[in-house]
Amino acid sequence: MAYQIFAPRHILLLAVVTSAIGFSTPESVAAQCLAYEPKVVRLSGVIVSETHPGRPNYESIANGDEPETIWVLKLKKAICVIASDDINVEADNEKEIQLVLEADQYRRYRRLLGQRVDVSGKLFHSHTGHHHKTLLLKTNEIRKQPAP
């Protein structure tokens, strides 16, 4: 008889535990991750300018490599991206995205350096020496966030 009294509690506990475990399955984590191109994504953060070593060795400006200045979107919260092929591999816990812009976009958006912005574009994974961050975003548009 005691079994019948406690059975509903055990069922409730089992349901709660199963629910909690369900939220951390690989499928649910993947559902929270972003997709690579051709999917357009929207990210928020602050744009900063950084200088990195470029040609010929991509190692040291002091030792003769050309300086390469890039724009980076610094995210408040890290993101993950689901692998789509051999180049666009899985990425996890990324908080900095290198922005890829056309020359006219650098002129148009220069006033937004240091500002909180929303950026839309297509993600891809680094694959050359000019790619200084793990993730890059071929940028469609940048909009300044309204003041809080």
Regions found by a protein language model. Name each.
Residues M1-L14:
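Bacterial N-terminal signal peptides that target proteins for export
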Residues S19-S28:
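C-terminal segment of classical bacterial N-terminal signal peptides
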Residues V29-K39:
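Short boundary/loop segments of OB/S1/cold-shock single-stranded nucleic-acid-binding domains
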Residues P38-T69, I79, G121:
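Structural detector for short beta-strands of small beta-barrel domains
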Residues L75, H127-P148:
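OB-fold/S1-family single-stranded nucleic acid-binding modules
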Residues A83-R108:
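Beta-strand/loop nucleic-acid-binding surfaces
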Residues D104-V119:
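Short nucleic-acid-contacting surface segments enriched for D/E, G, S/T with interspersed K/R
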